[in-house]
């Protein structure tokens, strides 16, 4: 019995270490990379990983259509225990609530390093920071498909170089299209509907599983009048120092009201603790989060 208990404890510790990493991990770097030009180049939205173990990358798109429907899709590549390539989609309107994943073999996918040009089977997302095409083949998604065009109305955004580093481990983010207009077709069971709306596209990549860097994060995008807001807070794990990293961007077509990141005059305020909803062992969660800047924006 004692041998069994010892073996169980050993396996538990081993699995925990395997999942979240070693107990000795570098803290968040005090200075984050700032080597790129403030002007984003289209190669930055191309493939940024090489396929090394633990790397991952995805290209994300969402749109809120004028009829109230919401579409989210993401083209994903991961290199953990094995190489995996897939597309995920969510579509919701008053009649449909669709969530689907489609996996592809390595010989069915292509990626460009010059710009966003991601092909998985007969599906793709491609563009040049200004205009994008997104196609999902109904044959791959149980009769659901899209043929959409996204036209950016704002310049691309990233905080500094868009890279959050802890030692050599990192997670990176580029908001290639902070806001834009969407038009095209939605296909449901052979019926095509012309649609219009507004859309967003970003690109994420890194070289270590996210649970080894973060406990959680919050992310928001929206519009107030002519201004687009992108806000986030990254909550690093205790092994990485336990820091909370806020991000706030507010911009219009010709003006950026604020662009703040990390300790650059931006603060987070939580109110309205949520009680009696989540397990007590969970971290505290709040229904109201405010991002405050030192200049009052």
Label each region the model flagged:
Residues 17-297:
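Structured soluble/peripheral alpha/beta segments that form catalytic or ligand/cofactor-binding pockets
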Residues 4-13:
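Sec-dependent N-terminal signal peptides
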